Amino acid sequence: MNNNLKSRGIMLVMSSPSGGGKTTISQLLVNELQGEIIRSVSVTTREPRNEEVEGKDYFFVTEDEFHHLCNTNQMLEYAKVFGNYYGIPRRFVMDNINNGISILFSIDWQGAFKLIDIMSEHVVSVFILPPSMEELKRRLYNRSGESDMINQRLKEAAFEISHCYRYNYIIVNHNIEESVQQIKSIFIAEKLKTHRKMFLEQVVKSYYI
């Protein structure tokens, strides 16, 4: 055994209102932390779309197989969306965490709260705020340009933001690169926490006591 204190992975849960920047931040974060963090891969009953890869984009199963996974406690959480089931496979998450690989979840507050409730030991949650509602409105307008849709998205954003208080960390996304570095700092600090260190007692006794 060497004195490299290897850490378990974390479940990095990120939420933001539409236009808040979590999709772009997620992509950049995974690129910067290659080999340390991967995106969550869900199980689904829907048909694969063009170029989707089994095990990378989704795990594709039949409805009977999906129900079996749920009934045997192999799903962390699941939901039915537009007639298809989606769920987070327990084994995929835990195998990676126990091998020191972290999982990134880019989800809404409801999904975040479910994971916080059932996997609090492993979850690190970050809520990403826009600089202001005016700035969010500008981003949404640049994205779609439809006033009715923007007004609805702003209402949904206000509701989403009203749930930010339960998250471990809150950042304000003034600048994408700065936000990525802030979350990267959170990631590094959380991985250094004592309770995430594997074989800590053995390493300390072998090398320091």
UniProtKB/Swiss-Prot annotation:
GO terms for cellular component: cytosol. SMART domains: GuKc. It catalyses: GMP + ATP = GDP + ADP. Disulfide bonds: none annotated. Residues 9-188 form the Guanylate kinase-like domain. Pfam families: Guanylate_kin. Coiled coil: none annotated. GO terms for molecular function: ATP binding; guanylate kinase activity. It is found in: Cytoplasm. Its EC number is 2.7.4.8. Keywords: ATP-binding, Cytoplasm, Kinase, Nucleotide-binding, Transferase. InterPro entries: GK/Ca_channel_bsu (IPR008145), Guanylate_kin-like_dom (IPR008144), Guanylate_kinase (IPR017665), Guanylate_kinase_CS (IPR020590), P-loop_NTPase (IPR027417). ATP binds at residues 16-23. It is an enzyme of class 2 (transferase). Essential for recycling GMP and indirectly, cGMP. Belongs to the guanylate kinase family. This is Guanylate kinase. It comes from Ehrlichia ruminantium (strain Gardel). The gene is gmk.
